[in-house]
Amino acid sequence: MDISPAEISGILKSQIENFGVEAEVSDVGQVLSVGDGIARVYGLDSVQAGELVEFNGGIKGMALNLEKDNVGVVIFGEDRSIKEGDTVKRTSEIVAAPVGKALLGRVVNALGEPIDGKGPLKDVAARSQVDVKAPGIIPRKSVHEPMMTGIKAIDGMIPVGRGQRELIIGDRQTGKTAICIDTILNQKPTNDAAKSDKDKLFCVYVAIGQKRSTVAQVVKVLEERGALDYTIVVSATASESAPLQYLAPFTGCTMGEWFRDNGMHALIIYDDLSKQAVAYRQMSLLLRRPPGREAYPGDVFYLHSRLLERAAKLNDDNGNGSLTALPVIETQANDVSAYIPTNVISITDGQIFLETDLFNSGIRPAVNVGLSVSRVGSAAQTKAMKKVAGSMKGELAQYREMAAFAKFGSDLDAATQRLLNRGARLTELLKQPQYSPLLMEEQVVIIYAGTRGYLDKVALKDVTRYEKELLVHMRGAKKELLAKLREKKELTSEIEDEIKKALDDFTSKFA
């Protein structure tokens, strides 16, 4: 092939013009020391706080301490393969997680990567930063719609509304997780009947520092009962590093916020935040931040407040969505005045206090009605529930007070005897087995029977049987009445007359 000298310069010019500088410029540093999930890195002068960095072998970490001569990085995963002198690379990304409906029915880790063996996530809507600012005051609206848990004691006396933060607090083995799982299961009938996604309630369950077997059991229950279809499970188990246990609640919250910001409703459960605080304490002490009370760092209050403030009910201009939070805190020997419990009690809009003594005496769910409170109150109840359950909390409080005195005296007047009689039956009526949440209209009928004296003549040992048989009767012969109550959501005089008639008929036949 002959090329004339005149063409040579033209060919060289075109080659030079097409020459690309493919070299990648990245900001790198070196590992000075590593241990206990923390790496000290030299270099990375322009790294941001909370930025994701990458070690050799693809292990990720987050820059938390920005000091004069080094950067403290917490490592997401095993630190065994990281050695002194290794290169660390900036990614210029703040820690983010995948969001959207593609995550429903999946189990993911604290970084949003699937760990359920069902393959990679498909059609992820976006990736969102995990630690963002909570909505301000103007975009919010006061809580006014009920978020039904399906548990009579809670929906009747300590109602939770959409957009509320209600703390579940108690010692180990008092049924805290059981309440959370029942709440998720209770959304199934509503979600199945929903015409659009805006009528559904999507759930996010964040397991922090729990045993793998416990998380597997929860997932199994949700799957068997068809509740995993509208639930995302985020898991950072006890065997995972402290940074991942610290991060998991933020990742879960971001996934829940996507529903809230797109005009839908979501519920997030943090099980439990005590373990997140312990993980954060471990990280902070290893990063040599000064310890405060109980050796927790000074900003442990801010850790939980910025997380829980992201649960909100948005107003009409912002799509009307909501994110409801049920944080769980484990106490030691019922000590509610420890540092983390008092912090979270002061951040949330009420607490459900579970007691070992009640649990052991067979009152389950073991809710202490005296210490539990919802600061939203009856605004988060349907009109029907407000009407039938309004007096119940007061009656039970009076009953407990009287029961304490009744131990001393045997000759009680008729009114006191009536009060004790009614209180004992209400306490019995509020017991509920696990995995059997009730619909709002069923609860209204049962509580109506209790507070309006239909049980006063029923023997105490027969109360549970009365309730079971009443439910069968209502779901069978009276299902139109339940449907009417579900639709109207209030106790009109016509519906009340029908309930009275149904209860009169049933009670007269009950034996």
Curated annotation (Swiss-Prot):
Instruction: Show the catalytic activity.
Output: ATP + H2O + 4 H(+)(in) = ADP + phosphate + 5 H(+)(out)
Pfam families found in the cross-reference section? ATP-synt_ab, ATP-synt_ab_C, ATP-synt_ab_N
Q: Residues at site: Required for activity? A: S372
Where do the annotations place ATP binding?
G170, D171, R172, Q173, T174, G175, K176, T177
Which locations, inside or outside the cell, does it occupy? Cell inner membrane
Give GO terms: molecular function aspect only.
ADP binding; ATP binding; proton-transporting ATP synthase activity, rotational mechanism
Annotated Gene3D superfamilies: 2.40.30.20, ATP synthase alpha/beta chain, C-terminal domain, P-loop containing nucleotide triphosphate hydrolases
The enzyme's E.C. designation: 7.1.2.2
Query: Which terms are listed as keywords in the entry?
Result: ATP synthesis, ATP-binding, Cell inner membrane, Cell membrane, CF(1), Hydrogen ion transport, Ion transport, Membrane, Nucleotide-binding, Translocase, Transport
Asked whether the keyword Ribosomal protein is assigned, the reply is: no
* Membrane topology label: Peripheral membrane protein
What family does this chain come from, according to its entry? Belongs to the ATPase alpha/beta chains family.
Q: What does this protein do?
A: Produces ATP from ADP in the presence of a proton gradient across the membrane. The alpha chain is a regulatory subunit.
Q: How does it assemble?
A: F-type ATPases have 2 components, CF(1) - the catalytic core - and CF(0) - the membrane proton channel. CF(1) has five subunits: alpha(3), beta(3), gamma(1), delta(1), epsilon(1). CF(0) has three main subunits: a(1), b(2) and c(9-12). The alpha and beta chains form an alternating ring which encloses part of the gamma chain. CF(1) is attached to CF(0) by a central stalk formed by the gamma and epsilon chains, while a peripheral stalk is formed by the delta and b chains.
Q: What is this protein called?
A: ATP synthase subunit alpha
Q: Which organism is it from?
A: Hyphomonas neptunium (strain ATCC 15444)
